[in-house]
Swiss-Prot record:
Highest taxon of the lineage: Eukaryota
CDD domains tied to this protein: BRO1_ScRim20-like
Gene that specifies this protein: rim20
Gene source species: Schizosaccharomyces pombe (strain 972 / ATCC 24843) (Fission yeast)
Phylogenetic classification of the source organism: Eukaryota, Fungi, Dikarya, Ascomycota, Taphrinomycotina
Gene3D superfamilies: alix/aip1 like domains
Protein name: pH-response regulator protein palA/rim20
Length: 701
């Protein structure tokens, strides 16, 4: 028996800091009991993954497996630093993933390798312990099946479904081989049973070969090895069947199975140089080939001269009966992964904790939003009240209003002022007068040329008349535009005249009222303003308290150790909401805010008795009037510019019509002159007296 060791996977040192921080967040008690479990986790990883474990390390495998299960149950699979492992197909290539499932799959893979290595060692003993080796091969197959059932990690090349299934079938084929060796060494076992066991051996190797061949990341050596093993055991199977046939005097059948056995043996020997396997494998095959050739040659001679029995036609061989005596066995160390293990018991489930923290954040966000709205409301009220109070004590309101009025005047001045507006309007008047004059001249000229052309029948035939009529129609369409420009000019003149009166009146009124208001003095209210500022200080203190509340986290309201006392999330959140309400005390917050606002309102009502309402109302009207005047100025200026653009475009269109008219007029005169010349020439040269001297070219045929 020859076996090939499953390639092992190696790993490297790993940082537990991210996992430690997450466990610290999830711990329910300040006594960090999870630290001991984490130390155990690191120690076992070094023992089982960094070094080479043995079959005596099964208890350590079990503990590490349980620790991983607990961390996965608490949804901490992705809260870890990257795990780095080599690929099974190449020890020089590595893959790295931040996931406990990947680490767990690698651990079970190493457990499978441990069982497999131990099984091969038992087979190589003298005498071999085939029964125990068979069990370990089945346990190794069970490990790969366990990975396939629970720890498929498709991102890794080593843990795709086809490759894991190939390893499982390969281990089962080796286990069935042990049973064959045990049965073959027992003289009491019948050949029919041995054949059935052997048939299952080569079928298992055949299945493993197909899976390895199609699996991504499969080591190429195992593709060749399973193929050779399949052919080797096929050869032996058909050799035993041929001997059974010979013993039953079925000589033709014996020869057919010998040929089939030799065919598979030669097929296996063809791979001699494909891969560097142990020379012993091919030495066995060569000896087997020689034996089969000798036996086939001898039996063919006997059958040809003595027995004369027909051989089995190619393709007519019956299917072989098989017996399966192995199966994948899940090791005891891989107990139920859903069981409750006594590790990290002080840590909450991550998903539960994340859900709680999300709800707590929503509760706190709602509280912050409510207090912000309350603060904003109070700030707006107090700001408005304080602005009114300050306007009573000083002339700031008057000054600000004066500045705003002056800003409006300055804006008008920067745009050119009334003189600039009148200048632009005057330019527009000139342009529109020019448009009217050009339009009338063009229409008059077209009418004259149309009347002149009507008397000339020859010109009508040449299309001149239709061109002039078409141009006349186009020019006539511009009449509406010319009239609109004239109307716009008249309207603008009226608006500018009215605007000049408004701006003069505004200037006189604003100067008079603002100068009168500036001379008035408000009563001394310094003492009352000090009182108002004290209310503002109380408000600032209240806002500082609220800002401190907004900085508090969930642990400041609800000790995390209390989570262990509430299995129901609704009751837990109810307690948290009550704790937040007790600390924020929204009712008390609103009462304190209302008291401050009421005090300021009383102060404002008292100060309003000193305010000169009439003047403030009048100055507001001045400000409004100045703003409207600025808007009207901008509107008039823009209107003048727009009408100027329209008039300029209209003038260009009429000028182009005049150019076309000039072209038609020149064309008309040129055609008349040419016609006169032609008439004179035709009357003077009616007959050519030298016509008999003209020589004509003869046409050549």
């Amino acid at each position: 028996m020859e076996f090939l060791n499953i390639p092992t996977k190696n790993t490297f040192h790993w940082s537990c800091d991210p996992l430690f921080n997450e466990l610290k967040r999830l711990s329910c008690f300040k006594s960090f009991t999870y630290e001991n479990d984490l130390k155990t986790f690191k120690a076992l990883r070094s023992q089982l993954c960094l070094s080479h474990p043995s079959i005596n390390s099964l208890s350590s495998f079990q503990t590490y497996h349980q620790l991983l299960c607990v961390l996965e149950q608490k949804h901490l699979s992705e809260c870890v630093a990257p795990f780095v492992w080599t690929l099974s197909s190449s020890s020089n290539e590595r893959e790295s993933f931040e996931n406990l499932i990947f680490e767990h799959a690698c651990l079970i893979y190493r457990l499978a390798c441990t069982y497999h290595t131990t099984a091969i060692s038992l087979c190589n003993e003298k005498p071999p312990n085939l029964v125990q080796a068979c069990q370990y091969f089945q346990l190794s197959a069970g490990c790969f099946r366990y990975i396939n059932d629970f720890y498929i990690y498709t991102k890794s090349l080593d843990f795709n479904e086809n490759l894991l299934k190939a390893w499982e079938i390969y281990c089962l084929a080796e286990a069935q081989t042990c049973i064959f060796s045990k049965a073959n060494s027992n003289d009491t076992t019948s050949e029919s049973i041995i054949v059935k066991i052997l048939a299952k051996v080569f079928l298992l190797y055949e299945d493993a070969y197909k899976l390895f061949k199609n699996a991504t990341g499969a080591p190429s050596i195992f593709v060749h090895w399973t193929y050779i093993q399949k052919l080797f055991y096929q050869t032996i199977t058909y050799q035993i069947i041929s001997r059974t046939s010979y013993s039953l005097n079925k000589y033709g059948e014996n020869i057919s199975y010998l040929r089939l056995s030799l065919l598979h043996c030669k097929e296996a020997l063809k791979t001699r140089f494909d891969f560097g396997f142990n020379v012993k494998v091919y030495e066995k095959l060569e000896k087997l080939e020689s034996s089969l050739q000798f036996e086939l040659k001898r039996n063919e001679r006997d059958n040809d001269f003595i027995h004369l029995q027909p051989e089995i036609p190619v393709g007519s061989f019956p299917l072989l009966d098989t017996v399966t005596m192995v199966q994948s066995i899940t090791p005891d160390v891989l107990t139920d992964k859903t069981a409750a293990y006594p590790y990290f018991s002080t840590c909450l489930d991550k998903e539960f904790m994340d859900l709680i923290e999300e709800h707590e954040k929503n509760i706190l966000d709602a509280a912050v939003k409510s207090i912000d709205c309350l603060t904003k409301e109070g700030t707006e009220k107090l700001f408005a009240l304080m602005e009114e109070i300050k306007s009573v004590n000083d002339n700031r309101y008057i000054t600000e209003t004066s500045n705003k009025v002056m800003e409006n005047f300055t804006e008008i001045k920067n745009l050119g002022g009334l003189e600039f507006l009148r200048s632009e309007a005057s330019s527009l008047d000139c342009l529109i007068d020019k448009v009217n004059g050009t339009y009338r001249h063009c229409c008059q000229a077209l009418d004259e040329i149309i009347n002149s052309v009507k008397s000339s029948q020859n010109m009508k035939e040449k299309g001149f008349y239709s061109d002039v009529i078409k141009l006349h129609e186009e020019v006539s369409l511009l009449k509406v535009n010319v009239e609109n420009s004239q109307n716009a000019k008249d309207t603008i003149q009226k608006d500018i005249s009215a605007f000049g009166k408004d701006i003069f009146e505004l200037s006189a009124q604003s100067e008079r009222i603002l100068s009168n208001l500036a001379e008035k003095k408000n009563p001394n209210t310094d003492q009352l303003l000090l009182q108002a500022n004290s209310y503002l200080a109380q408000w600032d203190l209240l806002k500082d308290e609220r800002n401190m509340l907004k900085k508090l986290g969930s642990n400041d309201y609800f000790n995390i150790s209390m989570y262990s006392n509430h299995t129901d999330i609704h009751s837990l959140l109810k307690c948290f909401r009550e704790a937040v309400d007790a600390k924020w005390n929204f009712r008390r917050q609103r009462e304190r805010q209302e008291i401050i606002i009421q005090n300021v309102e009383k102060l404002k009502s008292y100060l309003n008795s000193f305010k000169v309402q009439a003047e403030c109302s009048e100055i507001s009207k001045i400000l409004s009037f100045s703003q409207e005047t600025e808007k009207k100025y901008k509107f008039l200026l823009q209107t003048v510019r727009n009408e100027t653009e329209i008039a300029r475009e209209l003038y260009n269109i009429i000028c182009r019509a005049e150019e076309r008219y000039s072209q038609y007029e020149n064309r008309y005169e040129n055609e008349n002159r040419l016609n006169k010349i032609k008439l004179q020439h035709s009357s003077s040269n009616a007959f050519n007296p030298e016509i008999h001297k003209i020589k004509f070219k003869s046409s050549k045929k």
